[in-house]
């Protein structure tokens, strides 16, 4: 097998260095003069080339790790060939690259800015005079522009004060409350509290202060400048080649270092996928429990309280539970069996009709006068069990949340979530002291004690200005914005004797505001009003403002709110947005001179204005390559829900009842989701279960199910899963104090590994090796860091 004058080297690499840390082991020395014949090789259908001898060679040299009791055999080590010029050329991504004769020495990981790394050791290939109509450095300028917008709006992590005291043990310490405010911790002792809310004059002056925010004209100019860059053909071809290179580079890394990754993972005691923190970043309140859980809960209530009054009609008549589930059915004296209570027909109606038409704007008069039979029954089921503002004050929904979400998460300790709730545009309430959604929802959470240390809240804002305008609830776009943000700018709401502390407590657990861009959004314009007009002047006959108008004015109000909350030493909010698949077929009305789709408009707005991340990130796959490449370079957080995207939404009879312009997305298989491609390239991506009610989940741990399905289909191993979990934690809305406990990272500068997220937040490792907290092998993090640094060096060369 091996000639006497040639040797194959097997090298054991140190966990924190890429260079060999031990002397090479010659295969000749292992064979010696033994006359035993070499073991042959055979082809196996599943594995490939495998040894005929299933038992490890007893003559193989054994290595003992001094730090642990792990015994390593030669078969457990990666085979590292001697470096050649060809190997270095392939690592650079081009066979024409001529590497330096003497490679630079490998230095230990130190804190440094990846965008401004030294270029002294780069080969001449990186400095080739390639003709670009637009310089590649414009990508760096776009990232700087993004950082400028986000720091102005106080969305960066450094602008968010700590809301938790120091963590004791492995559990979260409850947040302490007091009248007129909440005890806030800025890495100080518990006695150093801030109670600025007691001064009403200071509050009024603070809420009326002016902030220097880029004007709409300046934002529009920046948007069009960025659009011209990402549409450049040569830059698009360059970005496409780099993305393809990143996709192909990761499998090569795994083939060369998979055993070393496995060895490093095994060295971490008592830390694997199941006992690493995992956060669902976009779990919807409207679907946070499964179909069988909802059915089981309804049957329990039917058995225990069948005569409970759950609804009162406008004519004064009452409807009980037993009457609700006998509408339009013969009186047999028996209830229906099994899943017939919550079947696919109801779920389809709930998703297509109720959430789009009745959920956001409460108009019971319309449903009672225009609906009957099955549709009325479906409406009452949704209103009774899936809403917090109803005749029974949301008692059933609170019980569902506590039973199937909060209690299991608190018991598991390692599962957390960011729960997304829709902002509902109600204009009046029975309680005269409460005239806005914020206080009603906060009061509901407090009444049923739904606040949990394992849950943070996202507020979803829908683009339903046309519906509100045509029903007479708003007269212009400014009134639409006032419904959302005016209660938060009213100092009297915070000084309210009973509801003020409750509102503060709720806002302290809100992490982000999400702008939802959906297929059902009104698209057709009738009056082409100039987009540069002020929101108070936008009536436009009910035409829906562009995505950029929504994003900019939500950004402006969020910026003002964050400045106020930071001055009061309260947590700040981030902005997130999504994108619908059908927007690729819709031309944007935002620019008078440039032609582009709403798809590109939504993604570019997210890049410029949103720090919280990009939702439904599978839609990024069809974006311009330069924009996709920018998302990688800036390490913008992305959230995908592969299981939720394969739901079959074929047209049915409900399509006739759906809102005008609804386009149902065709079903697609799991592997069509580009999630794995994004992960291989190195995007800051994480998984979410999103809506458990629709994806046929039959387990009590849906986020575990989501990761398990991905691991089964893509054959992910421990390092892959733990890297995804770490992404979900570091990009979440939980405080940096908790991230320090869970991941060993801090915003304070250290001399160890540094990780940039969103091109705005720098997270520093607090010790040389943090694998004990998250079990991501250091060699995997080295690969991600060096690959990203190489791409940045190529950009600024």
Swiss-Prot record:
Q: Does the keyword Transmembrane helix apply?
A: yes
TM ranges are: 627-647
- Fetch the InterPro entries from UniProt: AMPD, Metal_Hydrolase
Q: What is its main location?
A: membrane
Q: How does it sit in the membrane?
A: Single-pass membrane protein
What UniProt keywords apply to this chain's record, in alphabetical order?
Answer: Membrane, Transmembrane, Transmembrane helix
Protein localization: Membrane
Recorded GO CC terms? cytosol; membrane
Q: Which Pfam families match?
A: AMP_deaminase
Identify the PANTHER family for this entry.
Answer: AMP DEAMINASE, INACTIVE DEAMINASE YBR284W-RELATED
Entry's family note: Belongs to the metallo-dependent hydrolases superfamily. Adenosine and AMP deaminases family.
Name of the protein this chain belongs to: Inactive deaminase YBR284W
């Amino acid at each position: 097998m091996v000639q006497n004058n040639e040797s194959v080297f097997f090298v054991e690499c140190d966990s924190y260095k890429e260079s060999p840390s031990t002397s090479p082991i010659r295969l000749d020395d292992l064979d010696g003069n033994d006359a035993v014949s070499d073991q042959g090789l055979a082809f196996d259908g599943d594995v490939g080339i495998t040894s005929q001898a299933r038992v490890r060679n007893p003559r193989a040299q054994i290595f003992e790790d001094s730090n642990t009791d792990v015994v390593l055999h030669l078969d457990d080590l990666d085979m590292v060939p001697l470096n050649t010029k060809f190997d270095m050329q392939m690592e650079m991504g081009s066979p024409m690259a001529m590497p330096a004769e003497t490679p630079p020495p490998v230095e230990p990981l130190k804190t440094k800015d990846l965008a401004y790394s030294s270029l002294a050791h780069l080969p001449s290939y990186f400095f080739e005079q390639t003709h670009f109509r637009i310089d590649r450095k414009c990508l760096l300028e776009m990232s700087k522009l993004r950082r400028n917008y986000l720091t102005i709006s106080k969305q960066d992590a450094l602008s968010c004060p700590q809301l938790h005291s120091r963590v004791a043990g492995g559990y979260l310490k409850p947040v302490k409350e007091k009248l007129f405010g909440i005890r806030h911790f800025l890495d100080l002792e518990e006695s150093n509290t801030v109670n600025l809310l007691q001064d009403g004059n200071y509050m009024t002056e603070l809420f009326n202060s002016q902030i220097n925010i880029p004007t709409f004209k300046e934002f529009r100019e920046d948007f069009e400048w960025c659009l011209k860059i990402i549409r450049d053909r040569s830059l698009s071809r360059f970005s496409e080649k780099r993305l393809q290179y990143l996709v192909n580079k990761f499998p090569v890394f795994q083939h060369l270092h998979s055993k070393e990754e496995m060895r490093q993972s095994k060295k971490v005691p008592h830390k694997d996928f199941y006992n690493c923190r995992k956060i669902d970043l976009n779990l919807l309140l409207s679907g946070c429990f499964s179909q069988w859980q909802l059915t089981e809960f309804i049957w329990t209530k039917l058995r225990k309280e069948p005569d409970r009054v759950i609804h009162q009609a406008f004519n004064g008549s009452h409807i009980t539970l037993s009457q609700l589930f006998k509408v339009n059915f013969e009186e047999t004296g028996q209830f229906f069996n099994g899943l017939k209570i919550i079947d696919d027909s109801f779920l389809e109606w709930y998703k297509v009709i109720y959430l789009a038409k009745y959920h956001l704007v409460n108009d019971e008069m319309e449903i009672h006068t225009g609906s009957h039979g099955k549709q009325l029954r479906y409406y009452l089921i949704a209103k009774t069990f899936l809403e917090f503002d109803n005749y029974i004050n949301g008692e059933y929904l609170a019980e569902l949340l506590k039973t199937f979400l909060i209690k299991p998460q608190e018991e598991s300790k390692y599962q957390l979530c960011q729960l997304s709730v829709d902002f509902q545009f109600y204009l009046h309430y029975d309680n005269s002291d409460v005239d806005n959604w914020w206080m009603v929802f906060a009061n509901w959470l407090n009444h049923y004690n739904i606040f949990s240390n394992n849950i943070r809240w996202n507020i979803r804002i829908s683009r339903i200005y046309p519906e509100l305008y045509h029903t007479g609830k708003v007269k212009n776009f400014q009134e639409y914005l006032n419904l959302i943000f005016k209660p938060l700018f009213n100092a009297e709401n915070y000084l309210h004797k009973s509801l003020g502390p409750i509102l503060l407590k709720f806002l302290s657990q809100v992490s982000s505001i999400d702008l939802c861009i959906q297929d059902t959004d009104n698209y057709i314009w009738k009056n082409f009003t100039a987009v540069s007009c002020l929101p108070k002047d936008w009536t436009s006959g009910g035409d829906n403002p562009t995505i950029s108008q929504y994003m900019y004015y939500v950004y402006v109000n969020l910026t003002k709110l964050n400045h106020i909350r930071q001055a009061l030493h309260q947590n700040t909010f981030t902005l997130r947005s999504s994108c619908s698949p059908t927007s690729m077929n819709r031309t944007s009305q935002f620019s008078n001179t440039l032609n582009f789709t709403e798809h590109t408009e939504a993604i570019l707005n997210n890049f410029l204005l949103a720090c919280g991340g990009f939702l439904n990130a599978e839609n990024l796959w069809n974006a311009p390559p330069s924009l996709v490449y920018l998302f990688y370079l800036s390490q913008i957080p992305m959230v995908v829900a592969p299981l939720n995207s394969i739901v079959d939404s074929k047209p049915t009879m409900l399509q006739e009842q759906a809102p005008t312009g609804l386009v149902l997305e065709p079903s697609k298989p799991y592997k069509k989701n580009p999630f794995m491609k994004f992960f291989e390239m190195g995007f800051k991506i994480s998984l979410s279960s999103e809506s458990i009610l629709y994806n046929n989940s039959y387990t009590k741990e849906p986020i575990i199910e989501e990761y398990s399905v991905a691991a089964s289909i893509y054959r992910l191993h421990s390092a892959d899963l733990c890297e995804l979990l770490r992404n979900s934690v570091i990009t979440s809305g939980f405080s940096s104090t908790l991230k320090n406990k869970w991941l060993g990272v801090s915003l304070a500068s250290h001399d160890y590994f540094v990780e940039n997220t969103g091109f705005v937040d720098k997270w520093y490792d607090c010790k040389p090796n943090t694998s004990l907290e998250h079990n991501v092998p250091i060699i995997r993090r080295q690969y991600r860091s060096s690959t990203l640094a190489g791409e940045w060096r190529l950009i600024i060369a």
